[in-house]
Amino acid sequence: MNFKELDQFMNQLPERGVPACELAVTLEGKTVYHEVVGYANVAEKRPAARSDLRWLFSCTKVMTCIAAMRLVEEGKIAISDPVSRYLPEYTHLKVKNKETGEITDARETLTVAHLFGMMGGMDYDLKAPGIQEAIAKGGGTREIVAAMAEKPLHFEPGTSFRYSLCHDVLAAVVEVASGMRFSEYLDKIIFTPLELTDIGFVPTAEQEKRFAETYKYDNITRELTLYSGKNEYWLAPEYESGGAGLFSTVTAYSKFLTALANGKADNGYVLLKPETIRMISETDLMTPGGRDGLHESWPSRFFGYSWGLCGRVHLDPTISFSAAPKGEFGWDGAACSYCLIDPVNRLSVMLGLNVRGYTYGYHMLHPHVRELVYAGLNS
């Protein structure tokens, strides 16, 4: 292994609009690369460190999907189940016609598969009246997710793709199927068995002091400004967002990814059975309409990829021109963090960033880091 080119690229990132970056790579359960560059606070010149915390944003979705798949594995959830089996509020849904604006009863049944696959017809409108009313009443996960069912869907379930609150709804399904709060279930099957301490939904006072600053990038002027907002997906004190609610260190999240990629943790704990990991690696959830919607949403990000049971899933390396094998899966987040699970090579990659609006990151940085990792492993 030779990661010289990866090192060079990492050291160039502060010049490319990335104030701080941390990258952890594991192979066959062992860390083979872990580097931190830049400043956790640019104004104070505080160097980034492995103890830094950051909001994972949509990398949370990977953990939510894995938690749901654990329940699928145990027979407590079926992917084909109607969501209404767990959440009665989703029994009678409405659909708004895109062309006419007419609102009618949904003809198709919303299923758990549609939640996994972002084909539920939902959106990311956090200001919807029903959601705001539930927040004002002090609602938690179940109450706020129930309110999400009030807004008409953008299309019939299963007929297209739209990145949305589907995984927040999936977290509520996990709560019902497990009989536990979402955070309690994650603690039971992931945090405690994997010995993860610096991860969760609500940071302690000590942890708040260790958060790296989040910045906003202007893609036209290429200027960075301090991002004054918090995690806007933390809707209420008792709300646990399955779509974007977790914070973590790169080290803690990397241990989670390693348990999936390697088939077990370094302490021997098995999070998911090999056949479940194989199912995630091989499942493409997209219907023809879903595939059209996916590529319409992200025209240049899914060549050779589709959307499956845990975010993106690699289907065809001859189209993606990637060294990653078929079956690699993972996702990214609003502040440009990125994760990869490669069960074939037992490889995991966790890239931690804190930059909002960094378009370059999704289209260029992520795939480039991925290819440099594989090049380093093979050199």
Language-model features: locations:
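Short glycine-rich, acidic/polar surface loops and turns
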Residues: 298, 310, 326, 333-341
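Active-site SXXK
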Residues: 4-10, 29, 55-83, 170-175, ...
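Short, surface-exposed loop or secondary-structure junction motifs
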Residues: 93-323
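Short, conserved catalytic-motif segment at the N-terminal edge
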Residues: 2-56, 76, 92-101, 366-367, ...
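Acidic helix-start/capping segments at beta-turn-to-alpha-helix junctions
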Residues: 84-91
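Short, well-ordered beta-strand elements
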Residues: 339-340, 346-355
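Generic C-terminus detector
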Residues: 353-379
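Short clusters of small/polar residues that mark proteolytic maturation junctions
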Residues: 36-38, 82, 228-229, 353
